């Protein structure tokens, strides 16, 4: 086992503090509408340019083990805020730095670290309550666009596109962000349920120009197992021909004789038909087939439920207004399922989302909700160069997360003012002893740090701006760093999601409290440079 280097109290805290400040100083230059870029070297290809706090934080690794521990703890703040709210990572880093620096001074002055932490926790909970109370619901798509614009560093086009996408797919819809090949940033909305399985044979194509199979008002047969023979389906197929409608077959696979029969039938101009594989795998496939059945008002033909293909009747099939199939994906538009059943299915999946601990499962469940309840929108981010596209994609991701957070918990005044106003909730708050009161005072001072940093990044004195806002009785009065004007921030469109502000403060004070109460640090001792390899033992008596 390698030797360890151990540091105690002041020696430990000072080294850790250096690491905290190194990381936070690199991250905080990105804060606000006039925040600067950070250029990150890559081992291959062009360097990455970003204004995303968590991206900068994740790249930082310090040589000194003790300094690196401090940096990694603050990196944890940014990562946690990013996971919970998707934005506000720079704000949480700035808050953590401010609380840690003030807290370390108090510890050096002889105060009890545990009481300081209790005071910090007490103050944080009070300010969080104030932020929740001050939040108001998002009224319209213009406010959604404003939130997106602020988070995308003032790029109104990004805010508008996100607002339009959310309006089209609803608050439950899935919006994904991809890189575009061209210069333009564009939004594509897919209505209805789409899954990534295409037609099993190109002979099913009805539109040769687009190479798509389009079925108008079709019946939909949903089968859990493979179809290798159509013999059991003959009575059903005769009923469908009499009804004069097309048929879509969704099954685990359609193979051999069954597929050949369907293709020959289509080429001879008999039944208009197409077949696709079922989406997903294993248990997820069963769940997705059930989703399709509920959406289209049909039933999953499953042997587990004692159903046989021979006994399937036309009323067990689903229907939809239209089905469009390409070689890669199938889209079911306007399924004929009962709204009450679809709503019940959505709430059932939402319960699973709340209970799951896996990020992957949560993402897949959210996709299923979107396909049932709303739709799917894709924002394709364009730019002149690959570096620019990646930088813009970071900002679009942030803006998208911020708008989702705004819809969930409402909005508060932006520009760091919500935290300064939240500090008023600490007036008259007393801890159990003077050291706890010092912890409360630390939070009060730290709450101004994001506002000051936004002003400093805009080239304005942060102390002057903070002083003016403290003196104002108007809760929405603040400094618009983009235009360098004072006034009502709501009317300027400078707004933040309450969830982002709340999460940033909670995560920052949590990790800062741990850093302040650190008394010893243990790290692996670096191996001495040029250390000689151990000599061979004396083998005695060898020739």
Curated annotation (Swiss-Prot):
The answer, when asked if ATP-binding is one of the entry's keywords, is: yes
Determine the domain of life of the protein's source: Bacteria
The keyword Cytoplasm is assigned to this record: yes
Q: Where in the cell is it found?
A: Cytoplasm
Q: Which GO terms describe its biological process?
A: protein refolding
Gene Ontology CC entries for this record: cytoplasm
As for what it does, the entry says: Together with its co-chaperonin GroES, plays an essential role in assisting protein folding. The GroEL-GroES system forms a nano-cage that allows encapsulation of the non-native substrate proteins and provides a physical environment optimized to promote and accelerate protein folding.
Query: Which protein is depicted?
Result: Chaperonin GroEL 1
| Gene that encodes the chain | groEL1
